Amino acid sequence: MVRHSKNILPKTTNPNPESNRYPPHPADPSHPSRYHLHLQAHHLRSPLLSASAENRRRDPQNLSTTKATSPSTHQSPILPDDIHSILPFAHMNITHTTGQHTENSIRAPSSTTILWHSCQLHSQPSSISSSTKIVSGRVLFSDSSPCSSNPHTQQPSIFSCPTLAGRKLESSGSIFLSTTLPSFIVSIVYLLSVSCRLVPGQTAFTNTNSSVLIDIPILLCSVGSLSLILKEPKYRSYLAIVSPTLSC
């Protein structure tokens, strides 16, 4: 009777036994090969850089503490340097100052006009507002404008908004959507957010200082525009300019 002996594997001597108990984390910067492979497989699924991942990159020692205290918590990996080729808007600085909205806003109606006439969208009046949102959303968050914020850039910005987008439009409905309707909405939103208090039981007109002299003409222009644009279409351009000017 032959007894089969068990194959006993030789024990390997490891100078660092802790490495066998705790294998390297796939997102550990101390292991470049595993680290980059993990990023290539995971950065498309997690395109946002979390604050914890940023802290781990700055302080590698904090990684071991995080694993020891909360091993089940998943941390977002650090984005690679070539993320700009994947996300075209990743280079945009979202933290921006409102002082640059004035000079940046003049580029929005100009770009809308070029897009409107180059793509021949005259048969679709509703596309004016859509194209304006697309262009202005990109322009207002761009801080690369060489212009400086000064009062002289406010007037061209205000006048260009109603005139450039509707200068060569032939349809009366298109002019209404591009000039009169936006100016009416801007004035009403300004009055409701700044000058009025819409709390149940406490509805009131809150402005009591000198700015009330501006709020009253804004309200009159908004109410008067509803009747004038129906009887006298030639006054549409004037109302579209006066109302946003008072709001600014």
From Swiss-Prot:
InterPro entries: UPF0328 (IPR019081). The lineage of its organism: Eukaryota, Fungi, Fungi incertae sedis, Microsporidia, Unikaryonidae. Belongs to the UPF0328 family. It comes from the Eukaryota. This is UPF0328 protein ECU06_0030/ECU06_1690/ECU11_0020. Residues 1-34, 51-81 are annotated as: Disordered. Residues 10-19, 61-76 have a biased composition (Polar residues).
